[in-house]
Design a protein with these regions (language model features):
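Electrostatic, structured charged patches in enzyme active sites and in nucleic-acid/phosphate-binding
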Residues: 1-123
Length: 123
């Protein structure tokens, strides 16, 4: 039985980094050239944005009098942007290289706009 990925994409290595698809690796190469040309700056990959913080039980006082943090009831919900960079006008751009738009992605895209006021650019 062959181990295949759900949407048929293959991990690709480019300049020492591993990307989730050929399309994402090609975009990384394009952004690298744009950065070298001075058109963009501060290119970052896999930047985490917390959409909903983790939910915890209330803190309690421990046996020795210290504050004991409550245990996690629900883990945080986070979005990882494929690329974040500054354009030539000084604006921050958040990009996602999309092949197939899953329901989870669509919800996270809407939460990014609602929580952080950031519109994701889809490539």
């Amino acid at each position: 039985m062959r181990n295949t990925r759900k949407y048929g994409n293959k991990k690709v290595r480019y300049q020492g980094a591993v990307y989730d698809s050929r399309k994402e690796a090609r975009r990384a190469a394009e952004l690298s050239l744009l950065e070298k040309a001075g058109k963009i700056s501060n290119v970052q990959t896999q930047v985490k944005f917390v959409l909903i913080p983790s939910q915890r039980e209330p803190d309690t006082v421990g046996k020795r009098g210290g504050i004991k943090q409550g245990k996690v009831i629900e883990k945080e919900c986070a979005y990882y942007a494929d690329f974040v960079y500054k354009d030539d006008k000084g604006r921050w751009i958040v990009e996602d290289t999309k092949g197939f738009r899953t329901k989870d992605y669509i919800i996270k895209r809407k939460l990014m706009l609602y929580v952080h006021g950031i519109k994701i650019t889809e490539i």
